[in-house]
Regions:
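C-terminal and inter-domain tail/linker signature
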Residues: 1-127
Length: 127
């Protein structure tokens, strides 16, 4: 039987594989607590619309008790409006990101993250 930490890491892996890389927004409802699902969709859907070929790669995934910390690199092509910027058609590559999640009963109940938005803007020619 998998430990609580392994089960919690599996939730984050599904978020990356099925939602962020796979574009399956229906999975958001399975992975997030009901009160957070709409909030998650509010940032995921527009991001995937702007960068439909998004690829997140998990570099590190660490779990302790009900918490999971993840380090990612993200790549994608800017084909839709993003942060008020018209599509450039340019790619960004290997942008560093980190996500932190609290998981209860197999669902994300709290999440927050940081990303290198300046580097993404620079690679897209927007800064």
């Amino acid at each position: 039987m998998a430990s609580e930490q392994e089960r919690n890491k599996a939730v984050v892996r599904r978020l990356v594989d099925e939602v962020l890389n796979g574009g399956n927004l229906d999975t958001v409802d399975e992975l997030y607590a009901p009160k957070l699902a709409a909030e998650a969709r509010a940032w995921i859907a527009p991001f995937l619309a702007s960068f439909p070929d998004t690829r997140m790669e998990i570099i590190d995934l660490v779990a302790e008790r009900d918490r999971v910390a993840a380090r990612f690199v993200c790549s994608g092509t800017h084909t839709g409006e993003w942060l008020g910027h018209a599509p450039t058609g340019r790619r960004f590559e290997r942008i560093d990101e980190a996500g932190f999640y609290r998981i209860r009963e197999g669902r994300i109940v709290e999440s927050w993250g940081v990303e290198d938005t300046l580097r993404r803007l620079e690679q897209l020619g927007l800064r």
